[in-house]
Amino acid sequence: MGPASGSVARQDWAAFARRFLRTAIGLLAGYLTLAVLIDPYDSGRSTLFSAGAVRPQGPRTAAASRGRDPAFAGAVFGNSHIQLIEPARLTAATGIPFVQLSVPGTGPGEQLALFGWFLRHHPAPQAVILSVDDFWCTDDPALPNDKPFPFWLYSPDPLAYLRGLLRFSVAQEVVGRIGWLFGARRKRAVADGWSDYELDFLKRGTLDDERLRVMRETPVPDAAAPGKAGPDFPAADRLGTALAALPAETAVVLVFPPVYAAGLPRPGTPRAKAEAACRNAAAATLQRHRRSALIDARRERPALHDPGLFFDQTHYRHALARPLADEIAAALVRLRGTP
């Protein structure tokens, strides 16, 4: 091959590379345009194909649609430790239309992201309920969690959203939503976000599982949990900042969810002192918002010693969840009646 033919070959490869690059960029731009217009999780960033709902899916992504739904004026935030609080029960007792935005397996970082999303779409909510459990006791300001969460979906940064749309799982949902939007019989995810995990636990025979029974009855160690001994609790700091930004009329209820007796530390132990310090830091955030109340469902009482009311040390049954919901509702009614 002579110099001339080599030059031609290089030119051909350069032309091919340019065509390939232009094609790839075109396909990428085309996909992103389609994904933005379809808005796979009904985030409201595009309303061209908005159905005001999503097809049945997990709460990590379904919360994008629920959290912006103007039908709701109150929300519950947390994880599975507050998931059993039924929004319809709260609504019936308070007159406030509630949505459940709790997401199992999440900690303060994810919950504060959802809190911010809800407030961007409901700048003056009538009420918010926040569950604070031991995940909030981390001393890491990054508020880490080992479970994946779509922070990009709730980010105010448009570029973060576009990067999130490039995920393969999201591309699958784009295709799925197109089929759902134009389907004759499309099932919708539950509008208020409530999911009854008691039914799931009972179907799995959790109450009869000896291994789980032993785990439930095993006392927690006396030593403080690693990374949760304080004295700094950055999640509480961020919560205080969020509460301070709420309108004065918004009623806030902070809940320490129930814990089975074996899951509570022995008084006077390092673990008890660390957990108390964490709860005190969380409770202190309520000073940043006057119309607020604290419900400590961890307080000593016979129900916390009843194994029939708990699936494990932190997941309780309706017999505890319903009275807790009523207690929350009563607190909201009192707060809303406060001048």
Regions flagged by a language model, labelled:
Residues 18-39:
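Hydrophobic membrane-insertion alpha-helices, especially the h-region
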Residues 132, 145-249:
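Secreted/periplasmic serine-hydrolase-like ester/acetyl group-modifying domain
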Residues 244-270:
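Active-site segments of SGNH/GDSL-like serine hydrolases
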Residues 55-83:
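Short extracytoplasmic
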